[in-house]
Amino acid sequence: MVKGTTSMGGFTRKHVHIRCRRCGKNSYHKRHHRCSSCGFPDAKIRKYSWVKWYT
């Protein structure tokens, strides 16, 4: 068993986020079942004044 930086390379193989059905971005978290960009599957779209991509 190896501890430290070398063992962190094992985390790079898995895909945490997949493409979202609503916004199309690669932001849908597979385990949390929620899009970090638009908030899918919430009914209201995720929108904050400090986010610049939709202004």
Swiss-Prot record:
Question: In which domain of life is the source organism classified?
Answer: Archaea
Residues where Zn(2+) binds? C20, C23, C35, C38
UniProt zinc finger (C4-type) residues: 20-38
User: Which Gene Ontology BP terms does the record give?
Assistant: translation
Q: Which InterPro entries match?
A: Ribosomal_eL37, Ribosomal_eL37/eL43, Ribosomal_zn-bd
Q: Which UniProt keywords apply?
A: Metal-binding, Ribonucleoprotein, Ribosomal protein, RNA-binding, rRNA-binding, Zinc, Zinc-finger
Family, as annotated: Belongs to the eukaryotic ribosomal protein eL37 family.
What name appears for this protein in its UniProt entry?
Large ribosomal subunit protein eL37
Keyword Aminoacyl-tRNA synthetase set for record: no
Q: Which GO terms describe its molecular function?
A: rRNA binding; structural constituent of ribosome; zinc ion binding
PANTHER family the UniProt entry points to: 60S RIBOSOMAL PROTEIN L37, RIBOSOMAL PROTEIN L37
Q: Write down any Gene Ontology CC term.
A: cytosolic large ribosomal subunit
